[in-house]
Amino acid sequence: HLVGYSKKIKKEISFKELKKKLFFSSMKKSAIPYVTNYYNNDWGFCLSKKTFDSLSKTKKYKINIDAKFSKSSLKVAEATLKGKTNKTFIFDTYICHPSMANNELSGPLCMLLIYNMLRKIKNKQFTYKFIISSETIGPISYLDYLKNNKQIKNIYGAAILTCVGMNKKIFFKSSKNEKHFFNKLMRKSINKKFVELRFDPSNGSNDRQYSSPG
């Protein structure tokens, strides 16, 4: 598996040089980790520990990564359920980590369930927007789009759906504004034990963007 954002390269190298570019999990020897290398001029491969251990230490390895970086535009998927008011609530998730079930597929599936549930409700008070894009850069661009189109004033709140596919306790990360109604709603509506995390801009997902000033 190629490390995300790897550059184009074609060369022959020794195992000593190659192993610096290989990523694996020593704890889960059959698992292949997901690694990205955003904005660095580098390359690499992800593999299982078992595969790594089977590699010859004396052979030469031919590396041929036929990759290219091309100018394009960021794609954002948006679906809207109109309510009686323009007061808008956003459900956000991302699809920028290929081949990952919990971190990637669970968010859009959960969003689809919420969409179908809200779609059946007549005379909705709020307008709901469902956003699917790339993590971090996606909501930054989308919020800028809303600002430029004078829609940012209508946003009342946002919920980020990520890593919701495991049969474990629900983790709920509160918004920066502790008194926001959504925090109170979540605490009352979750019908089983959950872990509440305080907002922390130094880590997390798209909550860093939706709860940040500006």
Predicted segments with their positions:
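N-terminal hydrophobic/helix-forming segments and targeting peptides
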Residues: H1-Q209, G214
